[in-house]
Amino acid sequence: MHNTLDKSEAKERVTFLRNELHRHNHLYYIKDAPEISDAEYDRLFRELAELEALHPDLADPASPTARVGAPPTGDLATVTRTIPMLSISNAFADEELFKFDERVRRSLQTGDPVTYLAEPKLDGTAVELVYEKGRLVMAATRGDGVTGEVITPNARTIGSVPLHLTGDAVPMPNLLEVRGEVVMTKEGFEKLNALRLERDEPLFANARNAAAGSLRQLDSRVTASRPLTLIAYGIGRFSEIDAISTQHEIVTRLADFGFKTNSHVRWDLDIKGVIDFYRFLEGIRPSLPYDIDGMVVKVDRLDFQRTLGATSRSPRWVIAYKFAASQETTRLVAIDVQVGRTGALTPVALLEPVTIGGVTVSRATLHNEDEIARKDIRVGDAVLVQRAGDVIPEVVQVITGRRTGNETPFQMPATCPVCGTPVVREPSEAVTRCVNAACPAQVKERIKHFAAKGAFDIDGLGDKLVDQLVDRGMIASYADLFTLRVEDLESLDRMGFKSAQNLVAAIEKSRHITFDAFLYGLGMRHVGAHVATLLARAFPGIDQLAEAALAGQLNSIDGIGGVIAESVKNFFSNPENRQTVDSLINHGVALQFPEKEAATGHEMPLAGKTFVLTGTLEKMTRDQARQRIEAAGGKVTGSVSSRTDYVVAGEAPGSKRDKAEALGVAILDEAGLLSLLEPGER
């Protein structure tokens, strides 16, 4: 496309791209308020680089392609570093990584093997820490690579930043400059935003922005209150550099000095091994405690690094292989209001289709009316949409600079968009609800929940089939499912005799159900799978549970708070709900109850013990581990305290392991947990 531009058109386009990239650099580095996604920035940057390559006479030393980032703000003192913190060139496909390998080998012209170190590309804020004779004397942000902002008081508040280097087994250097990434865990980010929501403060768009904003505070007490972690990955100047010959030795030495380093680092890899590791990181990405946006690949030998050198922007011995974008910019064309199984009205953004992470996204959650108002989201807005793993895409930010004046503010409807019943919003809730329990939308969603895994688990009863059954008047309640016959189902779309036969068999099989799955399937508000398990353990049957709930006795059960107790009480106070339960029993639903074992018996080896799970386990998921612990009489909580008996730490355990160590709580690996669950099992 660029080959078709004449000289004046190319010059005009180059000027536009440079101005745009400078503006976005300033918004990203200085204001901590980016307007576009990383992927969109990368596209603009690549377009400019291609144009400059085609028209070398348009080269400019002040071009964004010749610079590392943006200049620092004047609010904090600045420092100029001797060895710049350069940017890293990006790759977006396997082919580009193979070309990188070819360039490296062609430049080195060596008969020695060329191997690589690969590590996750942390999505945080880069910093440099300077140590003299083992003491932290200065910390600075990356800034524009050469000049950074001094943040020493703030860095000292981060628990993972050593104030003094440790390690008796290695000589203490006179000078060491450590490069690392300050990140905020996903859990810490969610808790921080929840706290800011309570205080009516603006929410951070993502953990990276939260980390950057926390580091650049003028008041270090604010930084101290934020859940930040430093993960070290490299060095600048080092007085003992002659004793080190590889990049992986640097990582090992940093760990010896007391720094937290990335547990997912691999070395001695050829380029095919590097690509295999990239696939591995893609797979574990959702389960990591912190955000990563790709993989960094470095030539391992330091003498090879020195031979390869660097351009004005980036080293030639390193490249970042980035994941497919998790954020993209698109336009919000309409807002649809959906009705859930509890009557909650949820606004959903209808978007111009955009590809995020290899998936086409045309809808995104807007959460509720208050979130729309807080973010000032309007129909017609250009918006930043985020998709993380299997999480429903969400609109995280409005790009107000692109508004035309034709955008329309959103207003929640006064009546249910499905059944027309006037909607209600309680003063204490952020949710507007349709109060008509017979609303077809609520009926459909309740039955879908009832039939889902973890509840009645009716194989073959998908969402579209439920919609058909309700729309045709064939079912209106849970119990109606147990009256369906093969001949009834054959008339439905895409439902032949064999499929109908299989579905009837699956419904029949679901009649035999454990008490906890039954309770979960009823769809009581605030009663998820875990709460259902707690309730099922506490009572020998549905009648005893209902009696205790109506008497206000559920608060005495460990793990059941006031909100849950009130919700269960309200459920059983409604005669229609009692009738629903009775109808299911009358239609042959048979509840199964686990045999009660003595708390001290062999079958309940974890009775009275409290566990916290963190990191990625190898032989089972964390949810499976929770189920096994609870089945053995143990209790699983979400946070570490002095009352915790064990922390089970898998790969990339995060801050929970650190807290356990600080409190003296016993830490188990997966094999240790298995030995408690089943002596002799590994």
UniProtKB/Swiss-Prot annotation:
Its cofactor is Mg(2+); Mn(2+). It comes from the Bacteria. InterPro entries: BRCT_dom, BRCT_dom_sf, DisA/LigA_HHH, DNA_ligase, DNA_ligase_CS, DNAligase_adenylation, DNAligase_N, Hlx-hairpin-Hlx_DNA-bd_motif. Keywords: DNA damage, DNA repair, DNA replication, Ligase, Magnesium, Manganese, Metal-binding, NAD, Zinc. The active site is at 121 (n6-amp-lysine intermediate). It catalyses: NAD(+) + (deoxyribonucleotide)n-3'-hydroxyl + 5'-phospho-(deoxyribonucleotide)m = (deoxyribonucleotide)n+m + AMP + beta-nicotinamide D-nucleotide. Zn(2+) binds at residues 416, 419, 434, 439. One of its GO terms (cellular component) is cytosol. DNA ligase that catalyzes the formation of phosphodiester linkages between 5'-phosphoryl and 3'-hydroxyl groups in double-stranded DNA using NAD as a coenzyme and as the energy source for the reaction. It is essential for DNA replication and repair of damaged DNA. PANTHER family: CHROMOSOME TRANSMISSION FIDELITY FACTOR 18 (PTHR23389), DNA LIGASE (PTHR23389:SF9). NCBIfam families: dnlj, PRK07956.1. This is DNA ligase.
